């Protein structure tokens, strides 16, 4: 049992630790993805049921079967 515990601890020590810079980069990447989606989808009025519309409508609103930035419409 002790050998298993020591082995587990050794494996955990070998795992790379995320750094603050990694987290910051991930946040920047996520923000850029949001901008890309908003740019590509904003006000396009794609059908909510089409493949492009499905991606857009996850972030936007489906109004009268069209993807729109707000519930007020496109």
Curated annotation (Swiss-Prot):
Modified residues (4-hydroxyproline): 51
UniProt-recorded Gene Ontology molecular function terms: toxin activity
Gene Ontology CC annotation, any one: extracellular region
Keywords tagged on the record: Disulfide bond, Hydroxylation, Secreted, Signal, Toxin
Propeptide stretches in the record: 21-40
PTM per Swiss-Prot/TrEMBL: Contains disulfide bonds.
Signal peptide: 1-20
Main location: secreted
Cell location: Secreted
Tissue expression profile of the protein: Expressed by the venom gland.
Superkingdom per UniProt: Eukaryota
Family: Belongs to the conotoxin Y superfamily.
Record remark: domains: The cysteine framework is XVII (C-C-CC-C-CC-C).
Protein name from the UniProt record: Conotoxin ca17a
Taxonomic source organism: Conus caracteristicus (Characteristic cone)
């Amino acid at each position: 049992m002790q050998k298993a515990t020591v082995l587990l601890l050794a494996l955990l020590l070998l795992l790379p630790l995320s750094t603050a810079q990694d987290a910051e980069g991930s946040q920047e990447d996520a923000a850029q993805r949001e901008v890309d989606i908003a740019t590509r989808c904003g006000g396009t009025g794609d059908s909510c049921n089409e493949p492009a519309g499905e991606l857009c409508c996850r972030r936007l609103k489906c109004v009268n079967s069209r993807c729109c930035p707000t519930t007020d419409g496109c």
